[in-house]
A protein has these predicted regions:
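Membrane-proximal intracellular helices of multi-pass ion channels
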Residues: 1-445
Length: 445
């Protein structure tokens, strides 16, 4: 009797499911944006431009090759907004929400994937956390739209309702897409509202709130202002976020925006310190800013928001853990510490890995674009930082880039959104060593 070999069914890991989900939604979005109905001129958008826009929206980046307000129709803008919302919440979270609404039970495998997608510390209570994420997102986005409504309705009439909702979702999801461009003035972002205290403050607040992370908001909701009861991660996020908001604001106020009234300078300084982490709106001419300010914005872009949030970048916790580990090394301590707690050694190793991966992609992408487009390296570094950290700020070169350079940015945006560890674990899986090799010291520094 002939026995045929049995082929073991391949099981996708949670990390591979997350990546496949983002890729599938991005491709569907690109196909929808290619339809003639998606543009105001009823023309077919080239695939690479549609894919670039779809990836930018899904990865909540904001880099565009066509002006969103003047090129895309109401249908196209709706597709972009849907992609932004899916990307902000996460493909897995949105899928879980539909499953919950339909009354289906969430399997153990699905709960594990949801845990990885939301950066939750444990699998228990993950369904409840998903419900909280949906509620808090709806609350902030609707409240933001209501606050933006008077300004946009005053300028655009009934269209202002759509503008308020679009920009509120775009801000909370840290996407940076705007509808304010026209045929005569494209890619203007929020520059016309630079002196509007209400609009700039609301947009900035939505960006910060979206970038804090849903676990942080769960702590705030549960314990209110009792900071000592927050989990260590939430404490680190809040302190690091405050640090990364206040110091750049002071720098911009003192050295960059030195003209105009005190109110104008404060608004400009505050907004330009918020938006690099990682929203993509701007109220100032970024290309006209000094080289030192542009370099500071590159650093802020790479650091990004917080884990389990709508923001991208290396994440505030990565930055904080590296600083804590450096401080521990200076003091010749074995462990890095925060708020009376030791940081797990694997967290330090992961932080170093993520930082190394982001910096490698950042420099490699800039090198390829600078070579292909014959552009200054400083401009390309700004562009690749914006892409890999899913920010969306640009010095104006994005629409002029060739297909190769657009492909590089698409890859950087995708890799930046799915996350460093997700990509690593999906690519290499887990293969624990059965034995340990002999150890030998190596000189460092």
């Amino acid at each position: 009797m002939i026995q045929y070999p049995r082929y073991r069914q391949h099981r996708f890991s949670s990390f591979q499911v997350i990546i496949a989900g983002f890729a599938a939604v991005g491709l569907v979005g690109a196909l929808l944006l290619m339809l003639p109905i998606a543009t105001q001129q009823r023309c077919v958008t080239p695939f690479h431009e549609a894919l670039f826009t779809s990836t930018s929206a899904l990865c909540v980046t904001g880099l565009v090759v066509q002006d969103t307000g003047s090129y895309w129709s109401a249908f196209g803008q709706s597709v972009i907004l849907l992609l932004i919302q899916i990307g902000g919440l996460g493909v897995i979270t949105v899928g879980a929400a539909f499953a919950l609404l339909s009354g289906r039970k969430i399997s153990l495998k699905q709960r594990s994937t949801m845990q990885e997608a939301t950066a939750a510390p444990q699998m228990g209570g993950i369904v409840r956390l998903t419900g909280f994420i949906l509620r808090i997102t709806a609350l902030f986005e609707l409240a933001g739209a209501a606050l933006l409504l008077p300004t946009f309705c005053a300028d655009y009439g009934l269209r202002g309702i759509w503008y308020a909702l679009f920009h509120s979702i775009s801000a909370f999801c840290n996407a940076g897409f705007d509808l304010l461009g026209t045929e005569g003035a494209k890619f203007v972002s929020l520059t016309r509202y630079a002196g509007d205290p209400l609009l700039t403050t609301v947009i900035a607040a939505l960006i910060v709130f979206g970038g804090l992370g849903f676990l942080t908001w769960e702590d705030i909701y549960t314990y209110r202002l009792d900071f000592h009861r927050y989990r260590m991660q939430s404490k680190v996020i809040l302190v690091t976020t405050a640090f990364l908001l206040v110091l750049p604001t002071l720098y911009f106020y003192c050295f960059e925006f030195t003209a105009g009234s005190a109110q104008q300078r404060i608004l400009l300084s505050m907004f330009q310190s918020v938006t690099p982490r990682t929203a993509g709106f701007n109220t100032a001419d970024l290309a006209a800013m000094g080289s030192t300010s542009q370099a500071l914005m590159v650093v802020l872009m790479l650091l990004g928001g917080s884990p389990g949030s709508t923001a991208g970048g290396m994440k505030t916790t990565t930055f904080a853990v590296l600083l804590a580990n450096m401080w521990a090394t200076f003091r010749r301590r074995e462990d890095a510490e925060f708020f009376g707690r030791r940081i797990d050694g694997s967290a330090v190793k992961n932080a170093a890995t993520i930082a190394g991966m982001y910096l490698t992609l950042f420099f490699l992408g800039a090198f390829v674009i600078a070579t292909a487009e014959q552009l200054p390296m400083s401009v390309c570094l700004y562009e690749t930082a914006s892409a890999v950290a899913t920010v969306g700020l640009t010095l104006g070169i994005t629409p002029q880039l060739g297909v190769l350079s657009q492909g590089v940015l698409i890859a950087l945006m995708f890799l930046g959104r799915v996350g460093g560890l997700t990509l690593i674990y999906a690519a290499f899986g887990s293969s624990p060593a059965h034995s340990r090799l002999p150890q030998e010291k190596i000189a460092i520094g």
